[in-house]
């Protein structure tokens, strides 16, 4: 399978995953952001350390022929960047293993050589809070301070889970980029944003009257806002339904129409009468393992010992399974550009227009941050209420 086709397949999975996550949390009126790339990398690591049956289930879920393909997707955008102050994409991988166990040589080699992962031996059983602090410090460092806590030291369930663990795998993604055309902060003004319940909130909207990458489709518009470039081309995409309550129908279309995210891309700038999009600054956290299980990916999470290629342990190395995958992401969008970060942690336990169009994002919409050369989606989410941080 060609790499491009593999990425397109993964983007179809991304769309279905986004729908599942949003359906899970939409009743709470949540803004949503997460990094499918971060989750995919973690699943790739788990696949590499699994028995053949579990590995095949993960690859089938991700619609990828091999873990090599998954690694190539990440390498496509993680490498090749140039040093510039207004564009940064960094990924990091961390591993914490109990002092009573050790990594199998082949898995250790993969972690260190392919993923450049940092590995630490810790005492899960008697020092769970110290382990939690160490993981949180790692997340803080590798997200430039955007995510200071991924595991809670005040949650008794988390402490119990850590105490009974053998291995923790973590992946972090940090992205910061300036717009290729920055917004004029003097034009930013408060306006009404229409909520799904019919109420409105006043939030600051960025404005522009410049030509935009904008295209109208049946029932929705797509706006592409490019960032500054190096060898990679990153853009934010905003998918805005025409109807103020049209988000659910648009989400259904995105998740059921194969290739949607790769085929609805504005390629040409067009004059606009007005562009207004709200400033954003919010975070979102969810238990990715529960969503993945609901979508049919169950083998890594059963206590049958399917992760046989990761750890040698005198007592339970052959009974390792994923207890949970926790994912947290945050995003900030302002006149200068976008800053976003995400951390995934897996805890292992034994057992057409006649006039110049407007683009006014004053009601709930979907968004992605995408690398356009490869098609890889770094972040995806929804905005229901920009006033919520």
Swiss-Prot record:
Family listed: Belongs to the serpin family.
Keyword annotations of the record: Protease inhibitor, Serine protease inhibitor
Annotated segments matching region RCL: 337-361
InterPro entries: Serpin_CS, Serpin_dom, Serpin_fam, Serpin_sf, Serpin_sf_1, Serpin_sf_2
Role played: Probable serine protease inhibitor.
Site label Reactive bond, positions: 351-352
A single MF term (Gene Ontology): serine-type endopeptidase inhibitor activity
Pfam entry (one): Serpin
Name of the protein in question: Serpin-Z3
GO cellular component: extracellular space
